[in-house]
Amino acid sequence: MVRLTVDLIAKNSNLKPRKEETLAQCLKKITHINFSDRNIDSIDDLSLCRNLSVLYLYDNRISQVTNLNYTTNLTHLYLQNNCISCIENLSSLKKLEKLYLGGNYIAVIEGLEGLEELRELHVESQRLPLGEKLLFDPRTLRSLAKSLSTLNISNNNIDDIKDLEILENLNHLIAVDNQLMHVKDLELLLKKLMKLWKMDLNGNPVCLKPKYRDKLILTSKSLEFLDGKEIKDMERQFLMNWKASKDAKKISKKRRSRSEDASNSYISNFETVHHIVPVYYPQVGKPKVIFFSDVQRYLVHGNASSKCSQEDKTTITEDIGNLSLKESESSLTKNDIHEPHLLQNPKVKENLSEKKE
């Protein structure tokens, strides 16, 4: 196995020391070191490389990140395809902008607190135990919320990326070959990531859902590329018009439904059986006069109720007759006596005699 030391760096660098120039002075000039694919398994003290800004250590056998505390000017660190299982000892790299950790054994994204300048984080294709997925430490996500612009989490068996909504300045998300299933979850995420303009989700089950692309384009106005394909203005405008037409039809349908419901409710109330109390009004106008001759005609022709006895019929006839006689007598005037039998009345005779005299 090989350990990365300053001597190894000096031997493999293209530096040509000047006369009377020390090793420390030479190492201080180094800004880029490339020791990729050299079977390196550990990192020695690199404090003499104070101006180191880019370090390539990918495709090695490094299992632990150490001795980078004094490389405070480091901006790019390439550690992909090593044997790293834990992200640690990076808090002093205040100027770090790009960190590549893909192809390792990392199960949790953590230990990045304090990296306020980190813009790109690549943690794709971690070699995880079967059935496990890559997780995110909330503290790390909070610390990267304002700085991170590019995140690569591809091929990590991830089925939920809701936690990423805190990354308010994220503009490029790469999450291909995961287990994302639901379009609704992606819509909610896109509503939060207002600056996201490029997203790659190829290889996820969600890509096979109906209207997947259309729904995401309609949700995010900032998105310009989806799954490697550009979103053109004409495509977005067409989808917006289609959605507006669809929404208008829904609103119209709801209004018609409400109107029909109201009409049916009115008819239903109208048809409801109510108990109506009858109101009787007194008869107004001239009363009908029943003459004795009419009653006789009624009885002769048998129109009276069969239930009435002969005795009842006689009584009724007599009562009506008496009533008619009384009314006739009271209405007589001195000149109006047409019935001979009334002359037998003494008072009537007296009145007639006085009139003649």
Swiss-Prot record:
SMART domains linked: LRR_SD22
CDD domains: PPP1R42 (cd21340)
Protein name: Protein phosphatase 1 regulatory subunit 42
Region (Disordered): 329-357
Alphabetical keyword list: Cytoplasm, Cytoskeleton, Leucine-rich repeat, Repeat
Coiled-coil positions: none
One Pfam family linked to the record: LRR_9
Disulfide bonds: none
GO CC list: centrosome; cytoplasm; manchette; microtubule cytoskeleton; microtubule organizing center
Tissue-specific expression: Testis-specific. Expressed in spermatids (at protein level). Testis-specific.
LRRCT domain sequence ranges: 204-242
Organism from which the protein derives: Mus musculus
Compartments it resides in: Cytoplasm, Cytoskeleton; Cytoplasm, Cytoskeleton, Microtubule organizing center, Centrosome
Record's function text: Regulates phosphatase activity of protein phosphatase 1 (PP1) complexes in the testis.
SUPFAM superfamilies: L domain-like
Lineage: Eukaryota, Metazoa, Chordata, Craniata, Vertebrata
Post-translational modification: Phosphorylated; during the first round of spermatogenesis with a marginal increase at 21 days after birth.
Subunit-level organization: Interacts with PPP1CC isoform gamma-2; the interaction is direct. Interacts with actin, dynein, KIF5B, KIFC1 and tubulin. Associates with microtubules.
Gene Ontology molecular function, alphabetical: actin binding; dynein complex binding; tubulin binding
A Gene Ontology biological process term: regulation of phosphatase activity
Basic and acidic residues bias locations: 335-357
